[in-house]
Amino acid sequence: MKILKNIFAILFLSNIVFARPIIIKLATVAPEGTEYYNLLFEMGQRWQQETAGQVQLRIYPNGVVGGERDTIRKMRVGQIQASAMSSIGLAELTDQIQAFTLPMGFQNYNEIDKVKSVMFDDISKGLSQSGFKLLFLVDIGWVYWFSAEEISVPKDLMDAKIYTTAGDYITVELFKKFGFNAVPVSETDILTSLQTGMINSMQTVPILSLSSGWSALMPNMLDL
């Protein structure tokens, strides 16, 4: 059974004006060398080829410009022109993206594709109202619980230090309401926080856990 679905989107500032040649700075928390980074790299190569070098994509991976909230702020002031962003960042710009993060809301990719096709225009409109242009939405996999200690029932998480995104006060309060210990951490500080024991459990997609080195510190994955 699937818990959550994570969505990856490419955003552009809708009102940005470029001088030629165009250099587009794109920020993402996706680690360099992963499938998703490689897709972005290939996209940039294609743009450069199709425009005879007039459009160039400069990718900043691994969250080097900050977390997704930081990226949104830097896009608004023109430091960054584009972002490959997860549903966490997108939720800062439009509530409609939360449809893809409903617990137990989807059973397979066909259901996801159907909802994406129905909601794409509405999501795009919501982002446009915030000053951003949506290029496309892609899947990055099902979200699972990862933990340093073995978990099988909710009670096993009562003593865990659960990661939540810094600034996501609603999720923190929700965890606390049910007796869990939520620890807000920036996306760029997750690995350090795992190494120091500040957090020891989180919800994420397997490819990100593996490529970021988190799975070495949280070897237990709960498959619902």
Where are the predicted features?
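Enrichment for repetitive, rod-forming helical segments
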Residues: 9-13, 32
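N-terminal secretory/targeting leader peptides
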Residues: 20-110, 127-224
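Short secondary-structure capping/junction motifs at helix and strand boundaries
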Residues: 4, 124-125
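Sec-dependent signal peptide recognition
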Residues: 2-10
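N-terminal signal peptide c-region/cleavage motif recognized by signal peptidases
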Residues: 14-19
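A gly/proline- and charged-residue-enriched helix-loop-helix capping module
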Residues: 107-124
